[in-house]
From Swiss-Prot:
Protein name from the UniProt record: Elongation factor Ts
Cellular component, GO annotation: cytoplasm
Coiled coil: none
InterPro entries: EF-Ts_dimer_sf (IPR036402), Transl_elong_EFTs/EF1B (IPR001816), Transl_elong_EFTs/EF1B_dimer (IPR014039), Transl_elong_Ts_CS (IPR018101), UBA-like_sf (IPR009060)
Organism phylogeny: Bacteria, Pseudomonadati, Pseudomonadota, Gammaproteobacteria, Pseudomonadales
Organism: Pseudomonas putida (strain W619)
Chain's role: Associates with the EF-Tu.GDP complex and induces the exchange of GDP to GTP. It remains bound to the aminoacyl-tRNA.EF-Tu.GTP complex up to the GTP hydrolysis stage on the ribosome.
Length: 287
């Protein structure tokens, strides 16, 4: 059995990120064999990762890579924004993005499978749940991408135009988050819902007004809704005097598609109620 020196403990700590006492115990259990200690700690980490799998990971980062003809947009989640700013997490995201782009992956499932060992190692080291949530790959004549910090990302596919135009429109998408490409994609159901919402919110204003006046008010709201919801009808953020669709048309381009990712979008975060938690603990203690 090799002597458990301070230098050996320090090396194991640097290689694993675990605490000094944990490293010392692992080395003692492994008979001073640092590689075996690492294997044992990874095995222990895998168990720890499984226990944390139920924790809600709603923070994280968006990453994007493009070559002008294709792009991959990726979301990786963590439990806290603090972890999302750490190098270990950033490296995991970057390596995952590179793999997805190089292998031309169109779905997150194969990436999740191939990155599972690295994910478990990261979870074991940081003590937080980490998940590869989703990815999208797009291809086209011209592809542009924009990343706002590490929280919002967008990609745009054009037919015609250039990468700079596609990037500028992607920046607009990141800022405005349109629901549809153009007004023709808006379903009758969506329009009916908007109409009903308008009527409910303005019941007092329209009470007693002639039917044609009410109809004009509804039509005005629906027109505004279509402009707000569809990318081509929105005022371009860099020049509100022109619509996004007009901008593309003037450049000899057609917007084919867009994709928008925001960290944690659609993930329900738990709401901690400290008072309720204490009350529950007191009630349990009385039983």
């Amino acid at each position: 059995m090799a002597a458990i020196t301070a230098a050996l403990v320090k090396e194991l700590r640097e290689r694993t990120g675990e605490g000094m006492m944990d490293c010392k115990k692992a080395l003692e259990k492994a008979g001073g064999d640092i590689e075996k200690a690492i294997d044992d700690m990874r095995a222990s980490g895998a168990i720890k990762a499984a226990k944390k799998a139920g924790n809600v990971a709603a923070e994280g980062a968006i990453a994007v890579k493009t070559d002008g003809k294709s792009a991959v947009l990726l979301e990786v989640n963590s439990q806290t924004d603090f972890l999302a700013l750490q190098d270990d997490f950033k490296n995991f995201v970057a390596e995952s993005l590179e793999e997805a782009f190089a292998q031309k992956l169109t779905d997150a499932a194969p990436l999740i499978a191939s990155r599972e060992a690295a994910r478990e190692a990261l979870v074991a080291k940081c003590g937080e749940n980490v998940n590869i949530r989703r990815l999208v790959r797009v291809e086209g004549d011209v592809v542009g991408a924009y990343l706002h910090g590490n929280k919002i990302g967008a990609v745009v596919v054009l037919k015609g135009g250039d990468v700079e135009l596609a990037k500028n429109i992607a920046m607009h998408v990141a800022a405005s988050n349109p629901e549809f490409l153009d007004a023709s994609e808006i379903s009758a159901e969506a329009i009916e819902r908007e109409k009903n919402v308008f009527l409910q919110l303005n019941a007092d204003k329209i009470a007693g007004k002639p039917g044609n006046i009410v109809e004009n008010m509804i039509n005005g709201r629906i027109t505004k809704f279509k402009a707000e919801a569809s990318l081509k009808e929105q005022a371009f953020v860099m020049n509100p005097e022109v619509k996004v669709g007009e901008l593309a048309k003037k450049a000899g381009a057609e917007i084919v598609s867009f994709t928008y990712f925001k960290v944690g979008e659609g993930i329900e975060k738990p709401v901690d109620d400290f008072a309720a938690e204490v009350a529950a603990q007191v009630a349990a203690a009385k039983q």
